[in-house]
Regions:
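Bacterial N-terminal signal peptides that target proteins for export
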Residues: 1-11
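Bacterial N-terminal signal peptides
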Residues: 9-20
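Primarily auto-inhibitory N-terminal propeptides
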Residues: 25-170
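Active-site-proximal segment of zinc-dependent metalloprotease catalytic domains
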Residues: 136-142, 147, 154-155, 159-296
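Post-HExxH zinc-binding segment in Zn-dependent metallohydrolases
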Residues: 303-334, 339
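Non-catalytic extracellular/lumenal accessory regions of secreted precursors
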Residues: 330-375
Length: 375
């Protein structure tokens, strides 16, 4: 059973339990949480870029509690995060960004829509590849940019020079898209759109107007983020699958965007690997840290085959079912409720189309013929 089928089956199961009176006292999986205004970030200048661990703690010194407060954590919680996860780095302004370290690039593999755990939805006409929208008209947007960009005046331009981020490319011709590339982009978009389906957000491959991404003020309720899917060469020197700033989705500046995903490090553009990385990096923009254990920064999941599971903010490359989490596995070192945190950074849930109680749930109707009942 792939991820989409799991997601379709679970609401029906929950509804059946509620109607039968056996669901217990548990509430819905994700209650609505208000968008929380953040305190202003303290004015800090650090002597070096990308400090992590104890070095980052030492550099912040007496300013650490202020930075921790900005990220919604106590000083001790913030210290614990820096010490347990070396992928969390401080830039010279004291802002956190994450570098998804890997020992080496993931090996290239062949991924098709029939592979267990992959979406099996149909494709749109290929000339619509860069016009895909999951929820047009939503006030929040996640733009998946496969076409490349010139980065100027962003946090990634720490050297001051402009950066040329090349388009998604599988055939060595980066400024044109062949059939395989267009199909791959559509399947990647399907996967990411599925991950964000519970939210009132438009996941799109279309280059939308900047005012749908950039937030002009704290009263502007139309904003989003961009994930740029590019080659790491000439953009960011690392052996990593991506980089992203933490908790910048609702910033009133686009300085800390976009998030970057490096397809050339991810199985040479493997559909599943790239999609998982996109959802993961966008999650960092929305305030999420890694789901790991006491011995690993990333939890790679449990089980195997069609019943294998992993959290999106861990490592989802190798499991069929990959979901948002709040640390529902043995040895979890991060109990963030992903749904609650993302909402607090301005990503609202969709309005539920069916109630969560016996009084508000939709009545199941059916018919009977020849002794066989159908719903």
């Amino acid at each position: 059973m792939n991820r989409l089928r799991h997601l379709l089956a679970l609401p029906l199961l929950a509804l059946g339990l509620a109607l039968s009176g056996t669901a217990g006292a548990a509430g819905p999986a994700a209650d609505h949480v208000p968008h929380t205004a953040k305190p202003p970030f303290p004015q800090i200048t650090l002597p070096e870029h990308a400090a992590h661990g104890q070095r980052a703690i030492d550099l912040l010194g007496s300013r650490l509690p202020e930075v921790a407060n900005f990220y919604g954590k106590s000083a001790d919680e913030f210290k614990g995060l820096l010490l347990r996860d070396r992928t969390h780095r401080l830039d010279k302004r004291g802002r956190l960004f994450i570098v998804e370290e890997m020992d080496k690039p993931l090996a290239a593999t062949t991924a098709t829509a029939s592979t267990p755990g992959l979406l099996d939805g149909s494709l749109q006409p290929l000339d619509q590849t860069f016009l895909l929208h999951s929820r047009p008209g939503a006030k929040r947007t996640i733009y998946l940019n496969f076409k490349g960009a010139t980065l100027t005046g962003t946090a990634w331009n720490s050297s001051g020079a402009s950066l040329t981020a090349l388009p998604f490319d599988l055939d060595g011709l980066p400024y044109s898209f062949n059939t395989t590339e267009l199909q791959r982009i559509q399947y990647i978009w399907q996967r990411v759109a599925e991950d964000y389906a519970p939210f009132d957000v438009d996941v799109t491959t279309e280059a939308v107007p900047l005012d749908l991404i950039n937030r002009s003020s704290s009263t502007d309720d139309v904003f989003g983020t961009t994930v740029l899917i590019t080659n790491s060469t000439g953009v960011y020197s690392c052996s990593c699958g991506g980089v992203a700033y933490l908790g910048v989705f609702d910033d009133t500046s686009d300085f800390y965007k976009p998030a970057l995903v490096f397809y050339n490090q991810l199985g040479a553009g493997n559909e599943k690997y790239v999609a998982e990385a996109i959802s993961h990096e966008a999650g960092h923009n929305m305030g999420l840290s890694h789901d790991g254990t006491a011995t690993a920064n990333y939890y790679s999941g449990q089980g195997s085959g069609t019943t294998g599971w992993a959290p999106i903010m861990g490592v989802g490359y190798y499991q069929a079912l990959v979901q948002w989490s709040k640390g529902e596995y043995t040895g979890a070192n991060n109990l963030q409720d992903d749904y609650a945190v993302m909402q607090s950074y301005g990503l609202p849930l969709r309005t539920d189309d069916h109630g969560n109680t016996a009084a508000t749930a939709t009545l199941l109707t059916g018919s009977a013929s020849g002794g066989i009942s159908t719903l």
